[in-house]
């Protein structure tokens, strides 16, 4: 396939999460809102020198039915994780990070794009989901449902056409 790295780093680039921060499990956007290309691969490079196990921040990869975590990646310095971005690539670091205030979980994210496939679901925003062990939270469920609208972000971007 003809993959290209996202030239504008839409949603990518440098990510920095401080103590107490987290990233709930989600599916990434599938269609780039400016280029109209489909996101196919995520490359995450961890930049955490002297990261300790007790800080947490592991990247979790979940199965397509969101019933179990199938892999984790410790955010060790210079570790790279490459995974397909598709209709079932649920991932995140959902547990609050427990690092000192002067430390942060750092990573560089690069997304690779290609011509959109007809069979792919069209998501213009990340779709956040609840893990089986997450407590019921009606307010958070309402927010997840609101964000899940497939066209909720498209209205914020100008078309190149």
Question: What do these predicted ranges mean?
Answer:
Residues 26:
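Histidine-centered divalent metal-coordination motifs
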Residues 11, 15-23:
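Beta-rich nucleic-acid/ligand-interaction surfaces
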Residues 20, 30-39, 49-161:
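Catalytic core of Fe(II)/2-oxoglutarate
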Residues 7-9, 18, 38:
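Short gly/pro-enriched beta-turn/loop segments at secondary-structure junctions
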Residues 1-12:
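Signature of the catalytic double-stranded beta-helix
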Residues 42-44:
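Eukaryotic charged/polar low-complexity linker/IDR segments
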